[in-house]
């Protein structure tokens, strides 16, 4: 068996693995990555972030066509099958894989396609798909194997009418009705997508409200627009069992209700991909969700083994995962840029989309911070009136005495882009983080960015 020597070996080529590998390679280290799939990119590129967002964009264009009065004058509404809409996502995946493969080649990072397993803390055996088993010895190892959907044992996921968030992208038809169990980020995003395709959707939420980590006003807006689009939301509901037939599924609820639909999408939680890694051989333990614990340098209990991305749990965002991997690589060799990633913007790609950074009103109230609120409704901005994307708002939370920005919350078209302006000002040191930036800055007109000036004026007028 061939043994190859590296400074760093990274398990996984998703955002966290890519961030760690690229950072280590640019620091002059010899790096290898191990990918369990046949292509680089991880679940983010093939099963999660990229295909679902490409799918969402296609559905959003269909909705725009079917609701724009100008198009209604020249033809009837058009509806597309789920597989046809999915073709667009597949084209994006191919481009992403090609680009990322080039990045690894350009940085002279060796790629091993196969499954890696620890022999000891410095040795990993890779059962490659082409050349058979090989041994990789490394001074440092990064576990960035990501996560997978949680699949309870009492649901038959092999049934053709039952899907998880990984398998839903293989759906070969457009169901007339769909039960989505789990109203987290993934559940809400897919509820928007299928609702936009004309599917009758029931969204089952085991909690008492949607996305409770968001600001209450944003959550209320999301709930309203999902219902306005035809989604039936059921809060505080859990299931007892799922009955399957050739024509659909029946979900028996703990409350006694019975729900019937053509298909079921179960997306209630995720588990870390840590099984079959041989972690027992290095005495590395995982929690009940298969996730690894790390310190503020992304180091695990084993000195030379680090972890990043979904496999360590919160915040389970592709954007944060890349930075976590980069920080882990920096910490390995004492390089700058190894700060623990804590303040990250949240992007939720419902229709309309949501993004936020910083504190919510509930958090500031609990902390007894004297804050004030500034709002700008998109319907009052010229750009939104021009584009027809008038649904939504920008909300700024700031300290009423120092005018320091404390939170930015956005709901509506381009929310995940708009939030970064506020994030940039919030990251400024000292008195440079101030609401006055928006009051004194000239914004292009007409733009969505000018909502910051409108919201700042709205909030500043409340200060006395």
UniProtKB/Swiss-Prot annotation:
EC nos: 1.6.1.1
Keywords: Cytoplasm, FAD, Flavoprotein, NAD, NADP, Oxidoreductase
Function text: Conversion of NADPH, generated by peripheral catabolic pathways, to NADH, which can enter the respiratory chain for energy generation.
Pfam families per record: Pyr_redox_2, Pyr_redox_dim
InterPro entries in the cross-refs: Class-I_Pyr_Nuc-Dis_Oxidored (IPR050151), FAD/NAD-bd_sf (IPR036188), FAD/NAD-binding_dom (IPR023753), FAD/NAD-linked_Rdtase_dimer_sf (IPR016156), Pyr_nuc-diS_OxRdtase (IPR001100), Pyr_nucl-diS_OxRdtase_dimer (IPR004099), STH_gammaproteobact (IPR022962)
Binding-site list for FAD: 35-44
Major enzyme class: oxidoreductase
Catalytic activity: NAD(+) + NADPH = NADH + NADP(+)
GO molecular function term, any single one: flavin adenine dinucleotide binding
Protein name: Soluble pyridine nucleotide transhydrogenase
Gene3D superfamilies documented for this protein: 3.30.390.30, FAD/NAD(P)-binding domain (3.50.50.60)
GO-annotated cellular components: cytosol
Cofactor details (free text): Binds 1 FAD per subunit.
Main location, first listed in the record: cytoplasm
Gene label: sthA
Localization: Cytoplasm
Superkingdom classification of source: Bacteria
Single GO BP term: 2-oxoglutarate metabolic process
Similarity-based family: Belongs to the class-I pyridine nucleotide-disulfide oxidoreductase family.
Cofactor(s) needed for function: FAD
């Amino acid at each position: 068996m061939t043994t190859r020597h590296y400074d760093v070996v990274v398990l996984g080529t998703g955002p966290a693995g890519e961030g760690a590998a690229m950072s280590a390679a640019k620091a002059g280290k010899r790096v290898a990555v191990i990918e369990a799939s046949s292509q680089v990119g991880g679940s983010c590129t093939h099963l999660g972030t990229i295909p679902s967002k490409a799918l969402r964009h296609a559905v959003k264009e269909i909705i725009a066509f079917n609701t724009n009065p100008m198009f209604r004058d020249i033809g009837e509404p058009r509806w597309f099958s789920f597989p046809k809409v999915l073709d667009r996502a597949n084209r994006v995946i191919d481009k992403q894989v090609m680009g990322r493969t080039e990045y690894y080649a350009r940085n002279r990072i060796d790629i091993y396609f196969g499954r890696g397993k620890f022999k000891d803390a410095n040795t990993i055996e890779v059962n490659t798909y082409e050349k058979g088993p090989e041994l990789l010895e490394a001074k440092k190892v990064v576990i960035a194997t990501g996560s997978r959907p949680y699949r309870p044992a009492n649901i038959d996921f092999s049934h053709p009418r039952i899907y998880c968030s990984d398998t839903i992208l293989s759906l070969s038809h457009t169901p007339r009705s769909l039960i989505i169990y789990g109203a987290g980020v993934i559940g809400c995003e897919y509820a928007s997508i299928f609702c936009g395709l004309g599917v009758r959707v029931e969204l089952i939420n085991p909690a008492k409200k949607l996305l409770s980590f968001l600001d209450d006003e944003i959550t209320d807006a999301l709930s309203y627009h999902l219902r306005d689009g035809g989604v039936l939301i059921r809060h505080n509901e859990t299931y007892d069992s799922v009955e399957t037939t050739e024509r659909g599924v029946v979900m028996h609820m703990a409350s006694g209700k019975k729900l019937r639909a053509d298909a079921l999408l179960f997306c209630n939680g995720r588990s870390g991909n840590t099984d079959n890694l041989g972690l027992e051989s290095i005495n590395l333990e995982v929690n009940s969700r298969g996730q690894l614990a790390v310190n503020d340098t992304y180091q695990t209990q084993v000195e030379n083994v680090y972890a990043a991305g979904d496999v360590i749990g919160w915040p389970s965002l592709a954007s944060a995962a890349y930075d976590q991997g980069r920080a882990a690589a920096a910490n390995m060799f004492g390089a700058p840029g190894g700060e623990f990633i804590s303040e990250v913007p949240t992007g939720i790609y419902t229709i309309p989309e949501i993004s936020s950074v910083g504190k919510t009103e509930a958090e500031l109230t609990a902390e007894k911070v004297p804050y004030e609120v500034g709002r700008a409704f998109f319907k009052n901005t010229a750009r939104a009136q021009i584009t027809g994307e008038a649904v939504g708002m920008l909300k700024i939370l700031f300290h009423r005495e120092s005018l320091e920005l404390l939170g930015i919350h956005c709901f509506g078209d381009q929310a995940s882009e708009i939030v970064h302006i506020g994030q940039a000002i919030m990251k400024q040191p000292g008195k440079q983080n101030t609401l006055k930036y928006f009051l004194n800055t000239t914004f292009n007109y007409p733009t969505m960015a000018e909502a910051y000036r409108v919201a700042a004026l709205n909030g500043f007028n409340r200060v006395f």
